[in-house]
Amino acid sequence: MKNLKRIIFILLIILPLRVFADYEHFKLWDMSDGLSNNTVKSITQDHLGFIWLGTFDGLCKFDGVDFTIFRHDSQDSLSIINNYVEVVASLGDELWVGTERGLNLYSYKENNFRLCEWILPTGERQKITESIKN
């Protein structure tokens, strides 16, 4: 009887601990959920709470429910310069996007991209990727 009381006491202490155990929850998103590509090169969260993902096929903005995809459009000079996004960095209220063909700055207000270029002492404009190569 004494052993039974001891066992019951131990069970009463141990069993509630399982109730408070935290289990990690992960959600895997892929192209079927709206991601532009299943290979993600870079992830950042901006000052508004959006998650930005750089992929092999464009830049994705995730609002917690849906993805918005930004891709290069050769007919639009204000689109992202290239679909192969290497790096995405959020600095304050600016979003910097590094691609295979240059660095873009995203305008939240205008919902478009500006290509960042260096102006050389000669007055010539040069993409940052060209400056690095030289």
Regions found by a protein language model. Give the residues of each.
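Carboxylate-rich, polar loop motifs that coordinate divalent cations or form catalytic acidic clusters
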Residues: M1-N134
